[in-house]
Each structure stands twice: as C-alpha cells, then as structure tokens.
C-alpha cells in the first residue's frame, strides 16, 4: 500500500472513476497521495504503483477499464508511462516540473514555486538581504533570464543570474556568484542536483559563504541553508480538485502552481554562514 487514508467528505465525485499513478518510496509523492485521498468522500480510489512487480500490467489494465474517466499522474515517470500508453481520458499531472522539456498533460499542478513566492519568503526570513543569486539551466528553465531578472527587480531584489547547463559546471557557476549575492536560489533540476553533485556544492557554499536556498526538505537536510518548496499534500489535493472538475465535464482551467509553500532552515548551516534567519517571521520548519 502506498498510503492509507481516512477520507474527509469534501468532493462529490466517485473516486473509482479516478486512476492515480505513482511510485512508492518517494516521501514527497506519499504526501501528495495523502492529499489526493483526503479530497474524496468515499473509499475506492484506484492506485497503480509503478514500483510494484505488476505495475506495468496494472497500469495497462486500468487505462483500458471503462471505469476510468480521469488519471492523476504523480511524478514525471508516472506521466511518461501514462502518455506512452496514449490514455484516452484526461490526464492531470502533479509533482512534475513544467519546464521547456516537461512531458505534456491535459492539466498541470506545477511543482515550480514562483520566483515571486521564493523572494517573498526570503524577504521575511532574511530582511535587508536583497542580492539574489539564481542558478538557471537554460535547457530546463521555464522562463528566460531576462524575465527572471525583471521579476526579481519588481520584487525589490538585485538579481545575478548564472546559467549552468551541466553538472560539471555547477561549482563554477556558484563561484561566479561569490561576493556578488547574499544567497543563491537553486531551481529544481534532476540533472544539476543529484547524489553526486550536492555534497561538493554544499561544501563550496560553506567555503564561499554563499547560503544556498534549496527546493526540497532533502536538500535542506543535505546542507542548504534554507529551502522553499510546495506543500506536497496540498498539491495532491489541487490535482484531485481538478480531476473532480473534469469528471463534472468542466474545463480544468489554466495550469496552476502550488497554492501553499513550505519553508525550512538548516540551523547548523545557517549558524556556520552567519545567516541570522528570522524563523519567527513566517511558519518555518527548523532542521537542527
């Protein structure tokens, strides 16, 4: 079982009409699944776990079932697998980045936290620190550098944007920001940030006294000074609400980003960097 729920009576749709496709073993996906389950009023939501031995067969059978009227794909692998089978029903993507190379769905709940929301959180967390560094992968970024710069300036920040197109250039990109910015925003990017690159990046940030702002709880635990990321449970609930609209024959509306974000601080790293974050200024999870 991926998750177990006590369902709250909120949406009228029959959950058996909704197929949820995901992978077990990913904490963020489990939270999103919990949010999806909380949105339906009765048990019976069908889930295909791609990690199970019968995952591929279960998915094929579920997509062929006449009961299935909408699909929620949780994560990029789930979306790829559903799209590869040419699902004949609407597909809602959750927990998927919406960059230039993102797989397509009929409706999206983007994983991307807007730059305005990130900078707003940093303004509350670290007042007066307005020099914002941004590491951007041109191949994956949803917005061009000039659009990000304009947005940051509108929010009252002085941005320095460095493009980085491959992991081998990540430390060089960080070094280019030394002495120019107060903190560095790292956008979600599985190519740049992974189990091989995170540790040397964190060490370089400590040596260069460049606080990293990560995009997940795991990144903060690994050594980012702070993290700003979606409320994964609420993102799942957003996806369920869109699926329910589709079942009623309504349009899913424009693609949407996270309604709620979460902020975390690595207290030990912040102390090492001399970052006097004001954790009382907004709800913050503190990792010690």
Where are these regions (language model features)?
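Bacterial N-terminal signal peptides that target proteins for export
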Residues: 1-3
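Short hydrophobic alpha-helices and adjacent helix-cap/hinge residues
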Residues: 6-288
